[in-house]
Amino acid sequence: MRLDIRYLTRFRYATAISESQNELRACPATDHRQALVHYHVTTEPASRVASYLDYWGTRVDTFGIREPHAQLEVVAEATVETQVPVRPRTAVPTASLQEARFHDLHLEFLQPSPHVSWSSGVARAAHELAAGVDDDVVALAQAVHDRVADLEYRTGVTAVGVSVDEVFSEGGGVCQDFAHLAAAMLRELGVPARYVSGYLFTADDATGEDVIDDEVEVETHAWVEAAIPGWGWFALDPTNRQDVGERHVTIGRGRDYDDVAPLRGVFVGDQRHELDVSVSMRRLALAPLGDVAFGRSMQQQ
């Protein structure tokens, strides 16, 4: 599937601010299931945009605006081609999670992190769930996905920074909450799990249903990936109770939301502001990729 994506963020400040320094994470990655065809960032006021890959491998676009300004607009436009990822089909014994090399390579995705810290209640629920699952890491990851997918999708009941325990006790939230809770339960069970930020071409964030028209307004999305020994990362979308597919577009991966927040920055001035964010996605007819290729398979450990 080929998709055009337009990400827009607009800040309106109460009074003019200055010395604005910002980091944007909105660029689709190139990996084993998607290839970036085109990407461009513009800002108003205009600025010079520099780019680098952060510690987690996510592209970061940085820009600064020194002169006073009462409004900031950031537009990121991308074209990306995706394909359906391969799903693990063979059972993987859970004992393989304890292999020293695998454990050491994934240690950062086994530990608690700022938004993925949990108490005994979540831990107990995870182990009770695991007790009814066959000796198979893939089945275990699927069971955690299914359990989290049973939560209710509810907007406005949580905010960035809400704890995993609160999401679990409230029984609902949005995609970031689902991804954080799934990561917590997987890590508790010894399965490395990472948070993924991206876009989803869908008519409804709560169901993930496909789009009849070729263009739709969406929001940024989040899901989780579980590391399967000897296979790679298994991507699951508990918000929409589905495997990650060709309508999912990955931006970046990290321990939790903080590692892949779309836009963050600092400035000098009154912090009061209004914020508007919009994302539009358009499905295109497939065309030859030319010299753009999917990245080396990330199924390798």
What feature does the model see in each segment?
Residues 98-173, 181, 255-257, 279-287, ...:
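Secondary-structure boundary elements
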